[in-house]
Design a protein with these regions (language model features):
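Soluble non-cytosolic domains of exported or imported proteins
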Residues: 132-137, 154-158, 179-186, 200-207, ...
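Structured C-terminal subdomain patch of bacterial secreted/periplasmic proteins
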Residues: 179-207, 214, 286-366
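Second-shell loop/turn segments in exported
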Residues: 75, 80-84, 95, 127-133, ...
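Flexible, glycine-rich surface segments
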Residues: 211-299
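Bacterial Sec-dependent N-terminal signal peptides
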Residues: 1-24, 339
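Bacterial Sec-exported substrate-binding components of ABC uptake systems
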Residues: 17-93, 201-230, 342, 347-366
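A short, structured surface patch at a secondary-structure boundary
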Residues: 49-52, 57-67, 74-143, 149-156
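Extracytoplasmic ligand-binding site segments that recognize negatively charged/polar headgroups
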Residues: 92, 108-117, 159-161, 175-190, ...
């Protein structure tokens, strides 16, 4: 009896010790401590790195699992550093640029929304392939490019990439935008840095981002007021607002704002009718809007008369001329600094990066 108990104990002990071991190896991996990212796990071994992406829409499942190695020996492995990747988003291209890895990008999508001159020039000169629309990429162009990996952003219930997924090219899902805190998303820079051989540099950048972000949070926490904040504007009769579980809602709180729709449960954006939003928005102190192209308040009211009831001053960002979308996902401290300067001018913060400007046109009747 004692012999059987000893055997069972030995088996349990053996299994428990295999938790962070690579497949087919007795080596114990070193798990990288992620301080904020909830959907990312990185375990390093002597000859490769294993990365697991948790499914943000079903947290009991896995969105992707990758084995990064300098050798292609072994099924399911991705050779790093990437040499010719298809990077669908300007957000991630901007990060590759910051990490001095422009040469690792062989193709991009949605060129019309790129504000990065290096990549526009690359497409014009034929060094970078234009792969078309990110939701329906050009299959022929991808085949011609023959990238070593494809980096798209996943969307819930989108059906994936269709025939592209059958090409046999590794697909690395860039689900960083589904993290529920700004620093959680920014921490993904550590993953992307490992894809392009810039791990130490990426870790250093994130450390600086974290330090500055927390410093700014402390300053905003000491502010004596909490202005009521209204974000975004309606589109086609609907007003999509950040839910309480989104990184945007967390950012507003960290900036010392009272987000008027912090009661919205869920993650990501929540679409509401314009009427429902305006009922509460009339109490806003500050209205911030991101808009692709020029913005005119009188035209907004002409298009949607209900907006005349909102008297809050507008601060807007023209995303066609600024690098808001390219810079701030992995540098939330830059956006936080700008928002604190808008919400709490009494703190005397002078932002190095300015994305929002006051919209000069006053609301009708003022």
């Amino acid at each position: 009896m004692i012999r059987y108990i000893s055997l069972i104990f030995f088996v349990i002990l053996l299994l428990s010790c295999n938790g962070n071991r690579s497949d087919g190896s007795s080596e114990v991996g070193d798990t990288l401590q992620m301080r904020y990212a909830r959907n990312l796990t990185i375990v390093t071994y002597s000859d490769h790195t294993e990365v697991t992406l948790r499914n943000p829409w079903d947290t009991t499942g896995v969105l992707g699992k990758y084995s990064l190695t300098s050798s292609l020996k072994g099924e399911g492995r991705i050779k790093i550093p990437l040499q010719r990747a298809a990077v669908f988003s300007s957000v991630h291209c901007a990060l590759f640029h910051e990490l001095r890895a422009d040469d690792a990008v062989g193709g991009i999508c949605d060129l019309q929304f790129f504000n990065l001159p290096e990549y526009k020039k690359g497409v014009a000169e034929g060094r970078i392939a234009n792969l078309g629309n990110s939701l329906q990429p050009n299959l022929e162009q991808i085949v011609n490019l023959n990238p070593d990996a494809i980096l798209p952003s996943p969307f819930e219930n989108s059906g994936g990439l269709g025939r592209v997924e059958r090409l046999g090219i590794p697909i690395i899902w860039c689900a960083d935008y589904m993290e529920d805190t700004p620093l959680g998303r920014a921490e993904w820079i550590r993953f992307y840095g490992r894809l392009i051989g810039r791990a130490d540099e990426a870790d250093s950048i994130f450390s600086a981002v974290e330090s500055r972000y927390l410093e700014l949070c402390n300053k905003a926490h000491n502010a004596k007021t909490k202005p009521r904040l209204l974000p975004e504007m309606p589109w086609s009769g609907q007003w999509t607002l950040p839910s309480s579980g989104s990184s945007s809602a967390k950012l507003y709180a960290d900036a010392g704002a009272e987000y008027l729709f912090a009661h919205l449960k869920g993650s990501g954006g929540i679409p509401l009718s314009t009427e429902k939003v305006v009922d509460k928005a009339v109490n806003a102190d500050i209205w911030i809007i991101k808009h692709h192209g020029p913005l005119d308040r009188q035209q907004m009211i002409s298009d949607t008369p209900l907006l005349a009831g909102i008297k809050a001053p507008i601060w807007w960002c023209d995303t066609s001329t600024t690098l808001l979308y390219e810079e701030t996902p992995f540098h939330p401290e830059r956006l936080l600094e700008d928002l604190i300067a808008i919400l709490h001018p009494e703190l005397g913060i002078e932002p190095k990066y300015k994305y929002f400007s006051p919209l000069s046109t006053s609301p009708s009747g003022e």
